[in-house]
Amino acid sequence: MGRHAWPRGVFFDPGPWAIMSAIVVWLLTIYRVTPCVQHDVAKAVDPYQRQCYSDIPTLYRSSGMGHGGSLFANPDIAQTPLVTVLMAFCRRVVWAFGAEVSPKATDQQVLDAANAYWGVAQIVLFVAFLAVAISVMLLGRGSDTNLPVDDKGRPTQARRRSWDVFWVVLCPAVYLAGLIDFSMVPVALATTSILAWARRRPWLAGILMGLACAGSLQAAVVAFAVLVCCLRATRLPELGRYLLAGSLVLVVCHVIAACLGLHTWWAYLRSTFWSGTGLGTIWYVIQDSSGGTIPGIGWITGTLTVGGLLGLAWLSM
């Protein structure tokens, strides 16, 4: 074989095995949340007791989505611009397949539409999960070993597939939290942005990262990592194109959201920076044990995050 030989054949190719594993894991994830599917509006289901809670159908029923109307003008939504678009898309698909989405919809019709809406969202999130898996497979260890490049530094051959993809497709977090909300979509956009950056496509990488940040501000941490790496390597022209594209896309998304529903957009900002302590955080544990409230938790968390990132950047420069 030799140390530089590259084994070939289906048994040495992680691609089909990763896709097959992703399908199995996602089917198990869907099966895990089936006890929370409510079929009769008169028979409530306790998702906490059954440990299969999801924001997706809950928000559909509680926010009035089932009665129609623009989601950007609905203050009960208060989601990021990208997530709001995804919610509107899933509801449109449900309506196109015959679900009753109108002010005349009964509670049972809203429940039926919510279940169908959840099914459409599961498909959308599965596509995002596949995008994450494929991106990691083309970014993992050995994916760019000895690849020839052109005069611009772009590889002239396809990247090799890495077995590191199984760290993602077999991750327990996917099984436990993959269907809680639409968070998988910003993750997919962020990972595909990294792949575009690795293929020397700064404009495309910036556009994808801007969309990812429009779906979740946590994606900005990845953009900050790219910023630090470019400053270390003095790749300023590529960094400029990357940041310009990402900033423009992010600003355009928020401007459109504000124009379509200023109150909803402002409610989202308030929930991000001025909301109370949320479930599943260390702040909730502190608040619950002390019996008091923590004011300005969003600003405290943001300040600690920015300070930590600046500290890491200073250590890596």
Predicted feature residues:
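Transmembrane and membrane-interface helices of multi-pass
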Residues: 137-144, 148, 153-155, 159-173, ...
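Short acidic/glycine- and proline-prone juxtamembrane loop motifs at membrane-interface regions
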Residues: 178-186
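Perimembrane helix-loop-helix junctions
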Residues: 221-248
